[in-house]
Amino acid sequence: MLNENEKENYYATMKILVSACLLGENCKYSGGNNYNQAVCDFARGHQVVPVCPEVLGGLPTPRCPAEIVQGVVTNKEGINVDREFRAGAAKALAIAKENGVGLAILQSRSPSCGVKEIYDGTFSGTKIPGQGVFAKMLMDEGIRVLDAGELPKIILKNEDGKCQSD
């Protein structure tokens, strides 16, 4: 078990995997990004490992939007892209493990990176509880995963001293 000084040093130098789109990289399906200032502020001072599992899986940017349909990643045109998503997730997981990542901050609702909810597979914008392919792989490996949308709440709670994130 780490003592208080060791904990402080560990968290000060923690390696954090971050969805590349959250850092401003134009790798989102639309060709844009999901730049998130709270994520950048939180990551400052840590070693950041940016990844986009979808790009690592060989998908182009921009690309047709995809959702998980009955457990299979399928794009809006009905094309099965599950192999690309799973290959990219496996490559991103290998990067996380090679770098000794202790925490991952991922883009909300993505079929790769959704942490607590994803789109329901109807391409209607309806969300359901669930995890993206990459988020689930990280969780299965015991790597702590946070949804980028929850980060501001976690930071505020910690600054108030009322509670810490799970």
Task: Map each language-model feature to its residues.
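Divalent-metal-activated hydrolytic enzyme cores
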Residues: 6, 11, 26, 56, ...
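Short amphipathic alpha-helices and their capping/turn segments at secondary-structure boundaries
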Residues: 6-9, 35-48, 88-103
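Extreme N-terminal starter segment of soluble prokaryotic enzymes
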Residues: 12-16
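Short, well-ordered beta-to-alpha junction loops that form the rim of enzyme active sites
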Residues: 21, 107-110, 150
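Short, active-site-adjacent cap segments at secondary-structure transitions
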Residues: 24, 57-59, 111-114, 153
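Short N-terminal binding/cap micro-motifs at the start of the first secondary-structure element
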Residues: 24-31
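Short, surface-exposed acidic-centric catalytic microdomains
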Residues: 34-75
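Internal, conserved structured core segments that host functional sites
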Residues: 107-122
